[in-house]
Amino acid sequence: MNSKERVIAALNHHQPDQVPIDFGGHRSSGIAAIAYAKLKKALGITTGDIYVYDMVQQLAIVEPEILDVVGADVVELGRAFLLEESHWKDWVLPDGTPCKIPFYVNIEKRGKDWFLRSDDGIDLAVMREGCLYFEQVYWPWVDVDPEKQDFSDIEEVFGHSMWSSLAVPGGHIPLTDDGCRKLAEGAKKLRESTDRAILGVFGGNLFEVPQFLYRMENYLTYMGLYPEACKRLSQALCDFYMPGLEKWLAAVGPYIDVILFGDDLGGQNGPLMSPDMYREYYKPWHSKLWKRAKELAPEVNIHLHCCGGIEPLISDLIDAGLESSNPVQITCVGMDPQHLKQTYGDRFTFWGGGCDTRYVLPNGTKEEIKKNVHDLVSIFSPGGGYVFQQVHNILADVPPENIMAMFEAVRE
């Protein structure tokens, strides 16, 4: 099997020739640029710059040489874009390592803090001295009463939402006729250049975007106070996303294998809402988006990035049309690997949960890391329905020898 065949077999619940591996195939299976620079040095790779494609999380593009070293089977569609040197500009990581960042990122240093700004000069996020990542500092609707809104300005405020404004490569291309042509050309070239599975990030967040606009604690309160307004917002977001989804899939659907939607529905102690609230506030519109995507691209796997303890929601997610999810946060309440595999493994693909990044990967010995990986893979992988990745991104302070021990364990 080649990499694409391996991933597709797993997604179709067939046993592949070996466990498929994702390293940097999306924004929650990646590696912080500081850790990536150390990994390159440890591997003796002295060529190539460090390209930071996700400014908020400070994630590096994983180069083909390292994808080969770890045996990665997945690449993200965004690497098909920003291929010219002029598409990048110089910057320096918090530890002093030189790197490149996308040309369209508006960044400014004031004192010892770095600010990411919108095109019209609003501070959206800050990396304060001593920090390693950017945090949101501006919420467009923070003082707005949702009951008085008709949500007709959604497209406008997206430009002032940190995650939407600071797009990763590919996401910066508008869905105009010319933009869709560029997306299709890039996707076609990437498909022709790799036998790895291609994952395309669409987004389509219904629960998270209101938090980015109102501020998280405000929106969670509004869910209790103003249920009808929140449901109107879910409908408005769905209406906003749908034309873009149709254009985007028309352009890249023939070339990708997985479409990634996003919505963090869980926290460390379980879902951020009851199953009943999920069914009322989000499931109808998730279902519309996901099932429309499947209609437009039947061969493409419908995938959700969804952090946290989401076990009580999984049956509803499957019913809404979801086929797979990352990062499978096994240290959260309810996310016992054996239970997940036994309960849902015949109809749902777990993409993640392969190594505990909270305790084991950053702090464990090589032997402890390998045992952790062996134990988890032995639970998740039988019968297919599993793609390996560590639980979310590898953070800046993880030693390179620990990273390599993790991937060695998968190959073993």
Model segments located where?
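Short helices/loops that flank or line small-molecule/ion binding pockets
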Residues: 61, 80, 315-317
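Catalytic domains of carbohydrate-active enzymes, especially glycoside hydrolases
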Residues: 59-77, 252
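Aromatic-residue-lined binding/catalytic grooves and analogous aromatic/hydrophobic interfacial grooves
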Residues: 68, 76-78, 83-84, 96-104
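Residue-level detector of functionally special positions within alpha-helical transmembrane segments
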Residues: 2, 71, 93-96
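Outer-membrane beta-barrel proteins
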Residues: 52-59
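Ligand-binding clamshell of periplasmic/extracellular solute-binding protein-like
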Residues: 23-26, 59, 74-84
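Non-catalytic, alpha-helical, charged scaffold/linker segments
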Residues: 89-142
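Active-site loop segments of alpha/beta catalytic cores
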Residues: 1-41, 45-52, 135, 139-412
